[in-house]
UniProtKB/Swiss-Prot annotation:
Any Gene Ontology biological process: transcription by RNA polymerase II
Lineage summary: Eukaryota, Metazoa, Chordata, Craniata, Vertebrata
Matches recorded under PROSITE patterns: OCEL (PS51980)
Domain OCEL stretches: 275-385
Chief place where the protein resides: nucleus
Protein name: RNA polymerase II elongation factor ELL3
Disordered: region residues: 127-148, 186-275
UniProt keyword annotation of Repeat present: no
Recorded name of the encoding gene: Ell3
Sequence ranges of Low complexity compositional bias: 257-271
Gene Ontology molecular function: any one: cis-regulatory region sequence-specific DNA binding
Localization annotation: Nucleus
Length: 387
């Protein structure tokens, strides 16, 4: 084969027997993910993979570290073409024939969550191939519907920068310092207290020794994680006279009406809608129960960080436009032009990122669930320190 790249050369053992129910996928890795898989193979540990619809998460355990990657599954050969997986059986006698294992119908693209990559990989460029090759969504109107062609953008962990810091909001850290650090997460919202990172259990252990200020008696739960805003959260109802029309697009999706409201992210559920985590996670009474809560916390927090990064990156453009339109007087030509621009960009956004509403609701749910679990853990630890 002429023009074959060096990365595609070499020999590989066929470790499975093709069968009728065998699914073949084209795997796309960036350099960080490839190195992590190689390290995992050297350590002879088994990775853990979890699917959630057309996306999922891959965890590669190792000695003293744990790599977490997200991935999406998309179709191959959407333009009428197709891809087949072939292999060549190398034998000492007889011709070396090519054998077709089957068609590659789906492609699995893996991105890295940089906060969980071991130290040797942190020096690598964290921009994935998808970041370098893909264009911004607002620069293209003719992209096919499906998964957003945008790579995961990393949101830094406030606790990862300094392992010796205490929890934000404690007596050993001024609130002003936390406000500055939290400003990059969200605008027009009170600073929120982050949760410990799932990258390392050691971080959580170090945070336990930090003094915690007592909350007011009526406020049992600590402030929650930073939460990504809606794409049009910067637009108030007064600034958006056409919001009812925006919410009724070609597919009749009326859920947009909720996301246009500034208060939509903070609306409390109705009394009859009791979240399941309130029933599942009650007051902690033992160390074993605390450990189980912490394990559940780590699992959900890994998913939350990925969703928060995706939702936050996607809505950043509309946050800027919302702040810009607030500075203009209603009824002026400038206000009308910008309003029309927001409408057009949002239509392109919905076409490019159809799963945004679903991911945002999931992110908000995890936001509240993790805050509830963390509050129970801190309450139990504070009770034990006092005894």
């Amino acid at each position: 084969m002429e023009g074959t790249q060096e990365a595609l050369s070499g020999k590989m053992r066929l470790l499975f027997t093709p069968a009728a129910r065998t699914s073949l996928l084209m795997l796309r890795l960036n350099e960080a993910a490839l190195r992590a898989l190689q390290e995992c193979q050297q350590q002879q540990v088994r990775p853990v993979i979890a699917f959630q619809g057309q996306r999922g998460y891959l965890r590669l355990p190792g000695p003293g570290w744990s790599c977490l990657f997200s991935f999406i599954v998309s179709q191959c050969g959407q333009e009428g073409g197709g891809l087949d997986l072939v292999y060549q059986r190398l034998g000492r006698s007889g011709p070396n024939c090519l054998h077709c294992l089957g068609s590659l119908r789906e492609r699995l693209t893996i991105w890295a969550a940089m906060d969980t990559i071991p130290a040797p990989l942190l020096a690598q460029e964290h921009l994935t191939e998808g970041t370098r090759e893909s264009e911004s969504w607002q620069d293209s109107e003719d992209e096919p519907e499906g998964h957003p062609q945008m790579a995961l953008q990393e949101v830094s962990d406030p606790l990862a920068s300094n392992h010796e810091q205490s929890l934000p909001g404690s007596s050993s850290e001024p609130m002003a310092q936390w406000e500055v650090r939290n400003h990059t997460y969200l605008s027009n919202r009170e600073p929120d207290q982050p949760l410990p990172s799932s990258a390392s259990q050691k971080r959580l252990d170090k945070k336990r020794s930090a003094p915690i200020t007592t909350e007011e008696p009526e406020e049992k739960r600590p402030r929650a994680l930073p939460l990504a805003s809606s794409p049009l959260q910067g637009l108030s109802n007064q600034d958006s006279p056409e919001e009812q029309d925006w919410g009724q697009d070609a597919d009749g999706d009326s859920r947009l009406e909720q996301s246009l409201s500034v208060q939509s992210a903070s609306e409390s559920p109705s009394p009859e809608e009791v979240p399941d985590y309130l029933l599942q996670y009650s007051t902690i009474h033992s160390a074993e129960q605390q450990q189980a809560y912490e394990q559940d916390f780590e699992t959900d927090y890994a998913e939350y960080r990925i969703l928060h990064a995706r939702v936050g990156a996607a809505s950043q453009r509309f946050t800027e436009l919302g702040a810009e339109i607030k500075r203009l007087q209603r009824g002026t030509p400038e206000h009308k032009v910008l309003e029309d621009k927001i409408v057009q960009e949002y239509k392109k956004f919905r076409k490019r990122y159809p799963s945004y509403s679903e991911e945002k609701r999931r992110c908000e749910y995890l936001h509240e669930k993790l805050s509830h679990i963390k509050g129970l853990i801190l309450e139990f630890e504070e009770k034990n320190r006092g005894s």
